[in-house]
Amino acid sequence: MRKINCLAFLCLFLLCSCTALTPQNAELWTGRFSVASKSGTSVDRHSGSFRLIVLPEKKILNINGPFGTKIASIEETQDECTLINSDNETIKARNSSALVYQVIGIPLSIDRILAWLKNERNADDFNSYDLKVSSEDKGGALRIRAEGYVPSTDSQVTLIILPRREP
């Protein structure tokens, strides 16, 4: 019985030590997303979850697939932005807008995504680079929809984000 208690304590200790704590001064957003890309007659659909941590010195955006597998992690500081994909390949740029443009052909920054999540009504942030963005707040549940044409892939893209701010 004593061995079982020790084993249970050890497992509990390991599980607790694996959780990532968010600092007090961090702003934390989590949620789900779906992306549909139409090119010609083919349609690609993807979905997953995200976690955005905003700290005074950096922003971290983790993007996961539908079953929690890592798709990419983006970390932006004042001087540089780094993306690490699921194959652990690293891509760097001067900021998140340049990085996302380099990867998928849309200059979309973490700051612009954060403005969408906060439901800020700045027309320049919401509708730029051929993205038409709308949001609706139904009983505290925000739904963001961005639609636009991506020249680099010659496709029409629709992005839907269902965010929530963590306490």
Residue ranges, per PLM feature:
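An acidic-aromatic
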Residues: 58-107
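Post-signal-peptide N-terminal segment of Sec-exported extracytoplasmic proteins
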Residues: 35-72
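Bacterial N-terminal signal peptides that target proteins for export
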Residues: 1-8
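Mature, soluble, non-transmembrane domains
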Residues: 94-167
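Bacterial signal peptide processing site
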Residues: 19-22
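C-terminal motif of bacterial Sec signal peptides marking the signal peptidase cleavage site
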Residues: 14-17
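Charge-rich amphipathic alpha-helical interaction elements
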Residues: 29-40, 83-84, 104
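Short, hydrophobic/aromatic-rich segments at coil-to-beta transitions
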Residues: 26-32, 56-60, 138-146
